[in-house]
Amino acid sequence: MKITNLVDKKLASDYVAIELLKLIKDKPDAILGLATGGTMTDVYPRFSELLSANHVDLANVQTFNLDEYVGLEPEHAQSYHTYMHQLLFDHNASWNADNIHIPQGHVDDLEREARRYENQLKQIGQPDIQLLGIGENGHIGFNEPGTSFESETRVVDLTESTINANSVHFDHIDDVPKQAVSMGLNSIMRAKRIILLAFGERKRDAIHQLLNGETNESLPASILHQHPNVEIIVDDTIFNRL
């Protein structure tokens, strides 16, 4: 497990955007595993700028997002469909819509949707890079503490701490979805390379536990100890207090 310290979120986001660009230049049919949330808000605009500046053809690039809220239509302002299109997909015309994969959280049969998404992941292949954030309680994706390390894509109940953390994006806490369709920990671990980003004081304890604690299901991110190619990128706020 490699630890990379970059001064702040901007420099870290630039670094990740460049890593993604290098991958696609080397492998035009790359598979990207993408995350959402506040951690990634600078990564995708910078990545988009680099794609445009380098005139990269994205027609054969596949993307898989980690998760989507249950109950939100794709067009909802706080859906992860909207997030990804606003920050990335709408800015580069060569993205192939058929190759953009995000779970559907608004369908009637959510269990069927979870199975469909997991099967699609397995059929298309291992992500070359999987981006991750980390929750204050150590969750990755929406895999909350206690999630089985063998878990695959499924419907998950969000914890109170996750709902509270996500409430900043909604008008009222009652509007925050209580469930999501999320890739499982086993799904995530199939990626060839994993890059986890964490910024700010609120994420310091989770990173400290990840780096110094045991591998067990009470800290979902600790499964990353078992992966051969993980890079954890942190800012000075975290690194200087580890």
Curated annotation (Swiss-Prot):
Gene3D superfamilies: 3.40.50.1360. The keyword Hydrolase applies. Its EC number is 3.5.99.6. It comes from the Bacteria. Pathway: Amino-sugar metabolism; N-acetylneuraminate degradation; D-fructose 6-phosphate from N-acetylneuraminate: step 5/5. CDD domains: GlcN6P_deaminase (cd01399). One of its GO terms (biological process) is N-acetylneuraminate catabolic process. It is an enzyme of class 3 (hydrolase). The active site is at 67 (proton acceptor), 137 (for ring-opening step), 139 (proton acceptor), 144 (for ring-opening step). GO terms for cellular component: cytoplasm. It catalyses: alpha-D-glucosamine 6-phosphate + H2O = beta-D-fructose 6-phosphate + NH4(+). GO terms for molecular function: glucosamine-6-phosphate deaminase activity; identical protein binding. InterPro entries: Glc/Gal-6P_isomerase, Glucosamine6P_isomerase, NagB/RpiA_transferase-like. Keywords: Carbohydrate metabolism, Hydrolase. The keyword Magnesium does not apply. NCBIfam families: nagB. Catalyzes the reversible isomerization-deamination of glucosamine 6-phosphate (GlcN6P) to form fructose 6-phosphate (Fru6P) and ammonium ion. Belongs to the glucosamine/galactosamine-6-phosphate isomerase family. NagB subfamily. This is Glucosamine-6-phosphate deaminase.
